[in-house]
């Protein structure tokens, strides 16, 4: 307890004037070959079709499209889960939720987070001499030792969970709409369905709450400024750096102001998409100016769009999940349909990652952990197994060999949290459970357990509308391979050193800069 208190005290000292006074940029340790800088940008609830390079109907991602033309675009890239916390945990550990313990989202009142016996990417790289920063949405625990500053990040600036998990003074756009924070103590806003509590949304700098409620309309620019300043300082330090940016975009457009010109042609979601694209462009521009030759920039998303938000949700492109939509309910976020986990993905590293290349390799967010560790010349943490693989040969254009098999866990739809209920085998996909997620029209697909799984050939049916005939030789051959692959991975997980997250809830852990005020307000109205 004494050690933890001391670290909290040191990291949480107030910032006065300039940037990163507690980040040690000095060089120490042995001399070694240059290690690449790593910038990972993770969008929130962004659809595969929200990237213009993927989907011609999208015209709002000029910076990302330019990055695609200058780097590699992955068209068969998948989130490790179909909702926030599990996907982010897998990004930072290279392990599925059944191994790392994070199978569903953490709440504002969550006591726990990503289990502390799980080793994060930042912890590995910091041991290798990297200076590390995390900017944006964390959502892997905010209380005590689960905070980013205790999970390998020298610097943290952001909201510790989703940007809709607390009230603000200008709540932006949501469906259904949510009211603003009460303007004075003693008033209640009656949050209603699908809105969070009256506690104001906090913005942290390291362990300090610096705004509560946060001003969402200026948040994207604050994230860009912090990212740019970190890259600037780290690039002159002589040390390699890791920057992980968890965007507040896309989610729902809580930060955008109403479009003034041509509103019929400029949706709120598109305005938010352009704002996100500008933020990414600023980060890439800084990399180009100060660290272009030795920096890998990897952009992707945590899961697909949130269909129940209707016009405030993103585009799945051609991955409609038609079988599910005909049954009712959503085939996007929370589900194992393609719209729930197939996400945009780009890699950029001039001189190393070939330009204007489209990769069809079957890849996953799980692969970032082992790939980055290999590029840094580090070793994987011992005494545990990993679901991701080193795909640097794919990154460098030397191979199109990705995964043969991927497993898609339930992320809040029908079935148990974290259960591997869908299996991807080459271009085939087998569903053992379907239904359970809400669509825009309010319908929820019936929970259906398929003893003989639905199997789709994605080369012929990217829309997942027509499964294979169960009596066909093709179905029987795929079924045999899928059954064996699923049995093997479940046995492998059973034999692994797995963790279990603490999902206990306690109102006393809610972030609060002013416990004497009902909403924890520290900012004047």
Swiss-Prot record:
Cofactor section: Ca(2+)
Any one annotated GO CC term: lysosome
Domain of life (superkingdom): Eukaryota
The reaction(s) this protein catalyses: an aryl sulfate + H2O = a phenol + sulfate + H(+); Hydrolysis of the 3-sulfate groups of the N-sulfo-D-glucosamine 3-O-sulfate units of heparin
Residues annotated as catalytic: 84, 139
Function, as annotated: Displays arylsulfatase activity at acidic pH towards the artificial substrate p-nitrocatechol sulfate. Catalyzes the hydrolysis of the 3-sulfate groups of the N-sulfo-D-glucosamine 3-O-sulfate units of heparin.
PANTHER family registered for this protein in UniProt: ARYLSULFATASE FAMILY MEMBER, ARYLSULFATASE G
Protein name: Arylsulfatase G
